[in-house]
Amino acid sequence: MAGIYLHIPFCNSKCAYCGFYSLPSLKLKERFLEALKTEIVMRKDYLHGLIVNTIYFGGGTPSLLTIEEIGELLHLINNTYPIGNDPEITLEANPDTLSLEYLEGLHQLGVNRLSIGIQSFFDNDLQYLSRKHDSHHAQQCLDWAKLAGFDNISIDLIYGLPTSNAAQWNQNLDIFFAYNLPHLSAYALTLEPNAILTKQIELGKVQPVNEDDALRDYEILCRRAAENGYLHYEISNFCKRGMHSKHNASYWFGTPYAGFGPSAHSYNGNSRQWNVSSVEKYCEAMSAASRSPLKVGARRAGDSKEEPCFESPLPPLEGGNTKCGIEKEILSPEQHYDEYIMLRLRTHWGIDLKYMKREMGERFSTYCEKQAQPLIAQGRLSQTREFLYLTDQQMLFADGVAEELFW
C-alpha cells in the first residue's frame, strides 16, 4: 500500500491565520503544472511498485485548478503508478471556488472525497479569519456537493475564536451534525509565526486568542461528537465508524507515500524527502531535471542542515548554493522510534508495544514501557494491555507526553 500527495500551492488570497506555503496568485500555474507532471513521472520508482490506494490534492487551494487540469494529473498518475481498486481520491476545496457544475465535474473524474475549508458558519468568524466566503456560501457548497453525488465529505472548523462564544460554537456544531457528514476536522486557532493574524494581534489591531476559550470549545466538541456517534480518532479529527481519512491515516501508520509539488514531503519506509518551498525554484529544478538526471543526496541524523547535501543540475541560485529541489534524510532506528511515538500517540489506535518489539526490537519496547510508567501514574497516559494511548483530555498535552517517551 502507498499514497500520493500533490501540493497545489495557489490561493485566491492569503488567509490571516495560515502558516502553510502558498501563493496568492495564479501567474505561475501553467509553469507549475508542467513541473508537477515532470516530477510525477521522474519519481515513478520511488514507491517501488507499491499499489497506490490514496491520492490527495492538498494546498493551498487545489479547487483553483480546472476540471481539465485535475483530470490530466489523475490520468498521468493512473498511467505511471499501479492504482488499487476503488482508491480514495481527496480534493481540498474552499467554498468560494466551488459551484455545482465544478463539483459535478470532479465527481465524474473519480474524485470521491472532499475536504472543504468551511472554518465557521458565522460571518463574524469568517471576517476575523479573512475568509473569502460567507455563511450562506458555506452551506450552499455542502448542498451542491451532495447534489453532485458526493457522500464522503469532510469539513474543517476552527474553534477558540475571540469572535465566538460557547453558544455560537455549539451552533456551528449543530449545523455540521444537521448535514449528517461523515467526517470533521476541527482545529484550535493557533498563531503561526509568519501569519498575518499574528502580526495584527501584536499590533493590537484585532482581538487576541484566549486559550481558555479554546479549551472550553474542545471539551464541547469532544462531548457532542461522542453523543452524535463520531469517533475521535486523531487529535483534530472525528468520523463516523469506518469513515476516517485513509490518506491521513497512512501517515500515522507509517505507510509509504510520495509527495509532489513545492514543500511536499515523501516517505518510503527508510528515508524522508522534501521539496524546496518555492514555486519558482521548484519549477527551475524540475525543468533542469527533465534535461539531466536528478541526483538526490542523503543526509543522516546529526549532519549539518545549513547547506544542501545533494548534487544538482541547476546553475547556482541565491547565495551561490545549488539545489535540485529535493532533499533527503535517511532515518536512524532511533528516529524511526521517535516518529512512531509522535504519530501514533496522536491517534486513538495508540502505541502498540507488541508491534514495536516485533518491528523495532526489544530495546525500544522496553525503553518505551519504562518511560511510560511515571506518565501513567501521573494520569497523563493510559494503557490497555499492550496499547498506550491518550484520552480526550490527555490529548491536549500530547506533545509533552511524546517528548518524555522519545529516545
Question: Where is each model-derived feature located?
Answer:
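Minor-groove-contacting beta-hairpin "wing" of winged helix-turn-helix DNA-binding domains
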Residues: 387-391
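C-terminal scaffold of the Radical SAM
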Residues: 1-3, 22-45, 50-291, 321-362
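Local cysteine-cluster metal-coordination motifs and their immediate loop/turn environment
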Residues: 9-20
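Short, amphipathic alpha-helical interaction segments positioned at domain boundaries
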Residues: 395-407
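A short, conserved structural fragment
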Residues: 376-386
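Glycine-biased, low-complexity coil/linker segments
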Residues: 295-298, 306, 318-320
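Short amphipathic alpha-helical interaction segments
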Residues: 362-374
